[in-house]
Structure formats: C-alpha cells, structure tokens
Amino acid sequence: MAKTKIAIFGLTGCEGCEFHLLSLDELLLDFFQDFEITNWRLLSKKERADFDVAFIEGAVTTKEQIKLLKDIRETSKIVVVLGACAISGNVFAQLTPEQRKKLAPKIYDKNYKLKAEFLAPVEKFIKVDEKIPGCPPDIEVFKRILEKLKTRKIVSKIKKVAPPDFTEGIEGHGVLKINLKKREAKFVVEESERLVEGLLLGKD
C-alpha cells in the first residue's frame, strides 16, 4: 500500500516550527515510516509537486504566497497549518503599519523597500482542515493529527492546473520556485533578511 505523501511549506516567520519537528527524535522516525515526505527543504530533499497532505508554517505576506497557497490547496487533500504564525500571525502581527515604517529605516538602509506587502493568517486565503497551535507547535496535537492521517483513507486529487504553470513563494530565507507543468520544485536563496523583516510586519 502506497504511503500518504506529505509536503511541508514555510511562508514568512522564523522557521522554528519546522526545526521543532526535526528535534522530535523517535516520533520523527515513526513519521518517516508511516508517510512519504515529498517536499521539505530542511531535509534537503529533491522536491516534487505531488502530495496528499500539506503542512504550512508562517504568516502570509505577499501576493505570490497567496498564489502558492491556492496551488497547494488545489493539489492537497488535507491542509494543516503549523504553529501560531500560520494561525494568527503571532508576534509578527503586533506591529502596526505605522510602526513598521518607522522601524524599517533603523534596521535597513533608508532606501530599502520591504518585500512584505501585508500580514495575514493562512486561513484568510484557503480552507484549512487542521490546526496545530503553539510557538513552538503543540506536539500532542501533532501526534493526534498524525494518527488521524494514518487511519484516514486519503486519495490524491488529480486535476489539471490552469496557466500559469510556474509559481513561486517566499519561504524562510529564500524563494521556493515551483514548475507545476514539469512537476518540479527548487529552493533559491535570494536574501538573508526574512527573519528581521518578519519583525517589521504589521496588520492590514
């Protein structure tokens, strides 16, 4: 019997949720025995665009990320948001737009243009099936969701993806580029300021 395929994506945040999963020792070993990981940059796996379940961490901050989320929702049978940033924006949502504008020149060059356009939780843009709260995420909730996934019959959606065939989204400290037509994905590091920039994000 084929294993359920899981993809893990990070939007804008500190990536602590993903690193927290890497520290789970025996639980992580069981995780790999029961599921096939098709996308997870932290494990340096060759990423593919086919998966049944998507775990998403981080807040949404760009239009490109919205497009990525919709593509993920179209492909995935189940979407799970991981951690407080993906659920509510967490500490990144504490600054107002005015505070962000005031602080930006003190951290970056005065002519630096922030990449983030807004801040919103994942659920604002796509339907979410499960939530794992916490910063870092609640491991007991994570375990319960994994048990549900193991016992639940999951059938991959096979749908034609309408143009454009290429999309990208900011993920951690770089950009995840996905070619949906060729079913290929790669991660490109284009900047190193995502963590600090996250602290400057405000609400709509």
Give the ranges of each region predicted by the language model:
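Long, low-complexity intrinsically disordered regions enriched in Ser/Thr, Asp/Glu, Pro/Gly
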Residues: 198-199
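Iron-sulfur-associated redox domains of electron-transfer enzymes in respiratory
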Residues: 1-192, 202
